[in-house]
Design a protein with these regions (language model features):
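Short, charged surface segments at domain edges that flank catalytic/cofactor-binding sites
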Residues: 1-19, 94-98
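General structural signal for alpha-helix termini and helix-helix connectors
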Residues: 40-43, 58-61, 92
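A detector for short metal-coordination/catalytic motifs
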Residues: 64-119
Length: 119
């Protein structure tokens, strides 16, 4: 998990750029974070791409992710059904299996490599 978190965050930042999902502010460097709709603590949707978007540190840390605004915008972007699915999946019992974590790390590494090669 220690390796997967940063790789997943880098992927989200590469895909969604530098605009904060919740407030629209341009964010760079340490101000640019991977913010989670469903909090990542003990959550099986922690590494689900639908659950993570770029957020500025102000929205993500000081306003606890702005959950109401996040959900409203996420519903517009991925649809009500996908948001409800995230909520359902987040309540399930989950144990991180080693092979699943390795597969996710490889997936994000390959996706980042392909994005870099395409740029």
């Amino acid at each position: 998990q220690n390796t997967l978190g940063p790789i997943c965050a880098n992927y989200i930042k590469a895909v969604y750029g530098s605009e904060c999902f919740t407030c629209g502010k341009r964010c760079e460097g340490r101000d640019r974070q991977a913010g989670h709709f469903i909090p990542r603590t003990y959550s099986p949707v922690k590494y689900n791409e639908d659950n993570v978007r770029v957020q500025c540190s102000r929205c993500n840390e000081f306003y606890a992710g702005k959950p109401v605004e996040y959900e409203r915008k996420l519903r517009l972007q991925i649809g009500d059904e996908a948001v409800e699915n995230l909520k359902r999946e987040s309540t399930k019992a989950w144990k991180w299996e080693r092979q699943w974590l390795i597969d996710k790390i490889l997936y994000y590494r390959q996706a980042l490599k392909e994005r870099e090669e395409a740029a």
